Amino acid sequence: MAFNFMPKEVKFFDYLNLQAENIVKAADCFKAAVKQGLFDEETVRKIKDFEHEGDTLSHEIVDMLNRTFITPIDREDIYALANTLDDILDMINSMANRIKLYKLNANEDYMVQFADTINQSAQALANAVKHMHDTKRAPRAGPLHRGQRA
């Protein structure tokens, strides 16, 4: 019977990247709905689907953490990042639900600017997570850390 002392490579960065891409999709959907001023049942359901997918990814990441002895970065950092990414999706979902519930006029200028900021932040976050495993590119992951807009 042969033993494999090398741990099976777990793709934490791939799952975190999927979670970040999911945030971008939800932010894109939110931004489009704000620009159209349309938060109907279908739009809110789409955003809820992104949020549900994020919950699933977050649970999978936590399950992998519980089954993995050696992680590429500190396990608490992976856990915190996975939960924070899930929280972002929860907040986008909550905003969409409240806009629909209270029948707010989402096409106001301040809402459009807010949706643009959320979208730009989501894209910068996805870019940072995408390059997180590459330490050479990490300092140049995005312009937001320097206080600039993309």
Ranges and model annotations:
Residues M1-A150:
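Cytosolic, long alpha-helical scaffolding segments
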